[in-house]
Amino acid sequence: LISREDKRYTNQFQVFTDADFDMTLPAMEPQQLNFDQPFFVAEGAELIAKLQVSQVQQTLANQTNGISLHFSSDFGRTVENLANYFYHVEKRVNLAPFEQQIYEIIGDVDLEYALKYMTTFLLKFVKKEVVKQKRPDIFVKTLEAHGYIVKHDEESYRFNLRFDDREFETLVFDDAHDFIAAQIRQCEAVSSCVKLGV
């Protein structure tokens, strides 16, 4: 990010401004955009607001049963969903108050392990509207806390998501400009859903 020459340090990164992008382009179909490098935007740029309101499509998949959970979030990942929780725990980001409550339930449990039990429970709703669970474990409690399932009575739950087979194209970027140009056109918040394995 910086270089040293003749005892002086120089920035080796670009600071993006509004002039670098066409912000009048229409929204695109929801896609999963992947870019894992830092980038810099000029203070006060309209681009910052554009990024903040843009949407990130998130999928949590597991190896056990092929079921995946899909969520949408704002670019800053402030939405209270499972994908953001696991992301914040992995990256050691300060947890929001709600996420701290979730942490008290499941802690820093392995994502694959958690998904195995969560999706196995959710799979029961394919055939039943109401699923009995006399003694909810930490994974069922986490699903309930997020509102993905709701109490039907003291010993059973109802499904509060939807099953959907919608596919989202995944694009991987190695250039910050191209990523930002695509990200600011991601405007659709897709309702949280469960996708069944093939």
Question: Where do the language-model regions lie?
Answer:
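Non-catalytic recognition/regulatory regions in large multidomain proteins
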Residues: 2-198
